[in-house]
Curated annotation (Swiss-Prot):
PROSITE patterns: HSP90. Molecular chaperone. Has ATPase activity. NCBIfam families: PRK05218.1. Homodimer. GO terms for molecular function: ATP binding; ATP hydrolysis activity; ATP-dependent protein folding chaperone; unfolded protein binding. Signal peptide: none annotated. This is Chaperone protein HtpG.
């Protein structure tokens, strides 16, 4: 071995110490995953070399086939994994093997469930896979040299997985990284060709470069020199997406997904397609079964792995799918793009626009198929990704109708509160002559379900969609119709049930409104600047009064969101509607004292605001008026 220089002992970052302790003590029942993680890292290192060598061919240092080699020594109780990828400098080694992103560690630890099988798959997702080596090894050595550096700039890293590690400079002729695991007592099973072969076939068959094991060779005869070691490839070593769909098993698609998505669960669905003609590309797209921890961080890394003619170009190429599909994982391999393509070029290339349009439709088709054929699976998808899909109509006008068909809502058809009703379901159940889709937005399911706005709909047996996600009012500002039927907010404007109201009903409403003109004027005077209008309600059957929103005004849900974020909210006043058939309104109409009439009017107004989910501008005045009324009633 070459002489070590500039040797120093450094302490692990606190988070790494915690992680090593967790790794060693929490994942011992699923030990074999260490090899999956180290092979995955080696594969990434080779991908990085391929990419950097596009602009700097000298990094390949005269060629040599790119590969990963796994070997073992039964006597020494070691397993060695070697790649000829990009390699690491001394600084890289200290950074990558001595520290990890604090957010990654915190999220990893937060996501640990106690289920060892699940937890063992989390380590790849949070970029801490290297440390899984300490599950089976009591000492790990890393020898590495970055491509393009002189052989004297090799580096040797060593640790026993406790509080510190050693790092020194060494000579290393070959670029890339060699990891030597010194197995713990009791872990000798891994120093075995058959065991290693099985693990590689199980977890890493899809890796698109050769993974080699030493061939078993007969021992040399006495006095003869031992023959040179021969190697054999044990995985398929071909990019899975380049193979015909008919030749790829479901299990292979699932393992490949776990590799590209760093997920432990199988995907819900996938779509594998080869496009030929004007554009030539292959895509393999996956819909995950669960949401990643950073789904709602819109600036979080997202996108597909991009390959050009099977050469890896970049991770997280976000230009191929719209933002509302940021949960989709997979790869796209193009024959039409340049190998030196950059993120900036991707944003301006018309080829990308065509591919993005086609891939977006592909994902929507996949979701439609899932919703139709696997409704229970789609329910799971909706719980995880529904709010993200709701961003779609605003971002993707061309596919608005398709996206709308995938949305799911709670409704008055049952009391479960589950978002399971599609717009197609709603229309299929519609009343004869119903030409509108009715909905109500609010802060919570309990609030909208008990809203006075629904009274007339319950009386007539008309279903109303109940929307309670924060994004819903914003969503509905981009959805005007579906399948030729307009959306109508039941809390907005003057309610018109169209064909669902008989001519007799309409005539009776007009006569009542005329009859109550005097009461309307008194209420306008009493409520003054608090309201934009006072009118007789056609919405109510049980409640005395209600607040409606002006046709062009901002809804309460959107107003509350903007106020909470400190943004300026445009002024608007509600419409006060009253139920002329309610006994309280009858008493109000008969009230002779204008002072008492004013107090009662304000109490009804404040109660209507509370029923709508709004907060009172002057709660003390409301309590004072209510107490005054209670005292008068008790005398």
């Amino acid at each position: 071995m070459s002489v070590e220089t500039q040797k120093e002992t450094l302490g692990f970052q606190t988070e790494v110490k915690q992680l090593l302790h967790l790794m060693i003590h929490s994942l011992y029942s699923n030990k074999e995953i260490f090899l999956r993680e180290l092979i995955s890292n080696a594969s990434d290192a080779v991908d990085k070399l391929r990419f950097e060598a596009l602009s700097r061919p000298e990094l390949l240092e005269g060629g040599a086939e790119l590969k990963i080699r796994v070997s073992f020594d039964k006597d020494a109780k070691t397993v060695t994994l070697e790649d000829n990828g990009i390699g690491m400098s001394r600084e890289d080694v200290i950074t990558h093997l001595g520290t990890i992103a604090k957010s990654g560690t915190a999220d990893f630890m937060k996501n640990l469930s106690g289920d060892q099988k699940k937890d063992s798959h989390l380590i790849g997702q949070f970029g801490v896979g290297f440390y899984s080596a300490f599950i089976v090894a009591d000492q790990v050595e890393v020898f590495s040299r970055r491509a393009g550096s002189p052989s004297s700039e090799g580096v040797h890293w060593s640790s026993k997985g406790e509080g510190e590690f050693e790092v020194a400079n060494v000579d290393k002729a070959e670029r890339g990284t060699r990891i030597v695991l010194h197995l713990k007592n009791g872990e000798e099973e891994f120093a075995d060709g058959y065991r290693l072969r099985n693990i590689i076939k199980k977890y890493s068959d899809h890796i698109a470069l050769p993974i080699e094991l030493p061939k078993e060779q007969a021992p040399a005869a006495e006095g003869e020199e031992a023959p040179a070691q021969e190697w054999e490839t044990v995985n398929r070593a071909s990019a899975l997406w380049t193979r015909p769909r008919t030749e790829v098993k479901d299990e292979e698609y699932q393992e490949f997904y776990k590799h590209v998505a760093h997920d432990y669960e199988n995907p819900l669905s996938w779509s594998h397609n080869k496009v030929e003609g004007k554009l030539e590309y292959t895509s393999l797209l996956y819909v995950p079964a669960r949401a990643p921890f950073d789904l709602y961080q819109r600036e979080a890394p997202r996108g597909l792995k991009l390959y050009v003619q099977r050469v890896f170009v970049m991770d997280q190429a976000e230009s191929f799918l719209p933002l509302y599909m940021r949960f989709v994982k997979g790869v796209v391999d193009s024959n039409d793009l340049s190998l030196n393509v950059s993120r900036e070029i991707l944003q301006k290339d018309p080829i990308i626009d065509s591919m993005k349009s086609a891939l977006t439709k592909r994902v929507l088709d996949m979701l439609e198929k899932l919703a139709k054929n696997e409704p229970e699976q789609y329910k799971g998808f909706w719980k995880n990704f529904g709010q993200v899909l709701k961003e779609g109509p605003a971002e993707d006008f061309a596919n608005k109708e398709k996206i709308a068909g995938l949305l799911r809502f709670a409704s008055t058809s049952d009391d479960s509160g589950e978002q399971s009703v599609s717009l197609a379901d709603y229309l299929a159940r519609g009343k004869e002559g119903q030409d509108k889709i009715y909905y109500l937005t609010g802060e919570s399911y309990a609030q909208v379900r008990n809203s006075p706005h629904l009274e007339v709909f319950r009386k007539k047996g008309i279903e109303v969609l109940l929307l309670t996600d924060r994004i819903d009012e914003w969503l509905m500002s981009y959805l005007s119709d579906f399948d030729g039927k307009n959306f109508v907010d039941v809390a907005r404007g003057d309610l018109d049930l169209g064909n669902l109201d008989s001519e007799e009903d309409k005539k009776a409403q007009e006569e009542i409104a005329k009859d109550k003109e005097g009461l309307i004027e008194r209420l306008k005077a009493a409520l003054g600047e608090s309201v934009s209008e006072v009118r007789v309600s056609h919405r109510l059957t049980d409640s005395p009064a209600i607040l409606a929103i002006g046709e062009q005004d901002m809804g309460l849900q959107m107003r509350q969101i903007l106020e909470a974020s400190g943004q300026k909210v445009p002024d608007s006043k509600p419409i006060f509607e009253f139920n002329p058939a309610h006994p309280l309104i009858g008493k109000l109409d008969a009230e002779q004292s204008e002072e008492r009439f004013g107090d009662l009017s304000h109490i009804l107004f404040d109660q209507a605001a509370l029923a709508a989910g709004d907060s009172l501008k002057d709660p003390a005045a409301y309590v004072r008026r209510l107490n005054k009324l209670l005292v008068e009633l008790s005398v």
